[in-house]
Design a protein with these regions (language model features):
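Glycine-rich FAD pyrophosphate-binding loop
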Residues: 42-67
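Mid-domain catalytic core of redox enzymes
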Residues: 20-21, 44, 250-395, 491-503
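Flavin (FAD/FMN) cofactor-binding core of flavoprotein oxidoreductases
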Residues: 191-192, 382-428, 480-481
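Helical element adjacent to the flavin cofactor pocket in flavoenzyme catalytic cores
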Residues: 205-267, 271, 275
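N-terminal Rossmann-like FAD-binding beta1-loop-alpha1 element of flavoenzymes
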Residues: 23-50
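Active-site-proximal substrate-binding core of FAD-dependent oxidoreductases
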Residues: 463-503
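FAD-binding beta-loop-beta segment adjacent to the flavin cofactor pocket
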Residues: 343-350, 408-435, 439-442
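Mobile amphipathic helical/loop "lid" adjacent to a hydrophobic cofactor/ligand pocket
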Residues: 87-93, 97-205, 216-218
Length: 503
């Protein structure tokens, strides 16, 4: 274990307290950003206390026992890609890499069930998926030519944010209507949780370059094989094993920063720490800020953010409806299918088969689901079942046993043009207080990778202030391969997911 950092022995801003004890850090928020910061700081020798208002860890990437169905459900399906180097590093720390199943193939389904499979070939990047695109029935040859031209424009570098939406960029680069609907919209709305006419060009380009162009390894898709809370509860164990503490059902309501300490109020009680990381959503942070001149610039920046929703529809059928683990769904409201009864671990799968007679449990996901927010659960379930039967012939004779709908109304921030100028760095007006969250200045959009990066960046900033020296937790990006190296690929990351791929 790295040596402990005792900031008061070397920091000119420190107090005169006993330096034989590790510095204490409060972390407000038990989502990925807070957990990543907590794990990094605990590893560096800080005494971490993490506060989470819910009875479980994971934030928006969590699961719980649904009272209406009696089933453990994820609030929404989360996936990762091989390019998510910091998320993979976080999973390594938490010891859960073996709970991710990796896939090379991405199946696009049309209504009626016709499938087009995108998978890498032996060709060098960025051409490794070109053969699969040429064979894809869901796109015409004209669509494919248009997509190829746009990919060629994005390959050399990520365009700057000039206030243009990615939809306008696509039209300016000659994209067909079907190429936009069946490729660009399908991929990017799911990745960025926003409509293309509200997405900034740099973030759309980043998703395309990182996941489709950089290398075959970068585009591998990983899906958890356990409920999400099981994935992240081990991060709490990691913090506890290093002398830290996790307080659940204990959200931070207020904070106060002094010269030598910070205090937080949770459940009406005040506790004092040396440092504080605020790893909460931007709207929650806005309600916590003091009404002082020093807080005004941050409050003004937070006022520039807006959110976009995600909806997950969970369906239990009396029989298997598909032999696919997951699929992209085209031309309908439902966007992705995740066959949860095929994805979960063998032990849990056996238990479910005993309870369910070998039926199917699927989750359908709708990103940027503003059109569903005002609809009732029954309306959404009826739509989901109807569309499932269009895509999966096995669902046409299947009986729906139970269902539930989970709406994350404020799931992510909207990555609209110009938003980057308002995304704050981890340092704040209060020297002992730091920010984390996927909405902060990470260089990534609102993804699990962005959340973990924000936690690591906050931990680095705190450790620098505490110890007066540079501490690095952030992992390098995945290296470009093949021809993409001609465009200035970055250094190979400390961790690559090749060994994790499950065929």
């Amino acid at each position: 274990m790295p040596p402990s950092i005792y900031p008061n022995s070397i920091n000119p801003n420190s107090t005169n307290r006993d330096t034989t004890h590790p510095a204490t850090v409060a972390i407000a928020g038990g989502g990925l950003a807070g957990l990543a910061a907590g794990c990094a700081l605990a590893e560096a020798g800080f005494r971490v206390t993490l506060f989470e208002r819910r009875p479980y860890l994971g934030g928006r990437a969590s699961s719980y026992q649904h009272p209406g169905t009696g089933e453990v459900v994820d609030n929404c399906q989360h996936v990762l890609l091989g390019c998510c180097t910091n998320l993979l590093d976080f999973y390594r720390r938490a010891g859960v890499l073996d709970r991710i199943r990796w896939y090379k193939k991405l199946t696009f389904l049309e209504p009626g069930g016709r499938a087009s499979v995108i998978a890498p070939s032996a060709l060098p990047a960025p051409l490794h998926t070109a053969l699969a695109f040429l064979r894809a029935d869901c796109l015409s040859f004209r669509d494919k030519l248009a997509i190829g031209r746009a990919m060629a424009a994005l390959a050399p570098s990520t365009p700057a944010d000039r206030g243009e939406s990615f939809l306008d960029w696509l039209k300016r680069h000659g994209q067909t209507e079907q190429a936009i609907e069946r490729f660009w919209k399908t991929i990017l709305v799911s990745a960025l949780n926003e409509d293309l006419d509200c997405v900034s060009v740099p973030y759309a380009a980043q998703v395309v370059r990182e996941s489709f162009l950089k290398s075959a390894a970068a585009g591998l898709m990983g899906i958890p094989t356990v409920p999400l809370t099981d994935l992240y509860s081990t991060a709490g164990d990691y913090i506890r094993a290093r002398g830290g503490e996790i307080q659940l059902r204990a959200g931070v309501e207020l904070f106060r920063s002094e010269i030598s300490e910070v205090s937080v109020t949770t459940n009406g009680q005040e506790q004092k720490f040396d440092y504080l990381v605020l790893a909460v959503p931007f709207d929650v942070l806005g309600r916590m800020l003091p009404d002082t001149p020093s807080a005004a610039p941050l409050a003004a920046a937070l006022g520039q953010f807006s959110t976009s929703p995600i909806t997950g529809i969970h369906l239990w059928f009396d029989r298997q409806i598909s032999d696919l683990d997951h699929a992209v769904l085209l031309d309908r409201t439902m966007q992705w299918m995740f066959h949860k009864s095929r994805l979960i671990t063998a032990r849990e799968n056996e238990a479910r088969e005993n309870d369910n007679g070998g039926g199917s449990y699927v989750e359908l996901v709708v990103s940027c689901s503003r059109g569903l927010i005002e609809k009732s659960k029954s309306e959404i379930v009826d739509m989901a079942v109807k569309e499932s039967r269009e895509f999966f012939p096995g669902a046409r004779g299947a009986k729906l046993l139970k269902s539930t709908v989970i709406k994350e109304v404020h799931a992510t921030y909207s990555p609209r043009p110009g938003i980057d100028q308002y995304r704050p760095k981890p340092e704040t007006a209060w020297p002992r207080v730091f920010l984390a969250g996927d909405w902060t200045a990470t260089g990534w959009p609102a993804t699990m990778e962005g959340a973990v990066r924000s936690g690591y960046l906050a931990a680095e900033a705190l450790a620098r202030f505490a110890g007066g020296k540079s501490v690095s937790f952030l992992v390098s990006d995945l290296a470009a391969s093949g021809l993409m190296r001609l465009f200035g690929g970055k250094n190979q990351s400390a961790y690559a997911p090749f060994s994790l791929f499950a065929p």
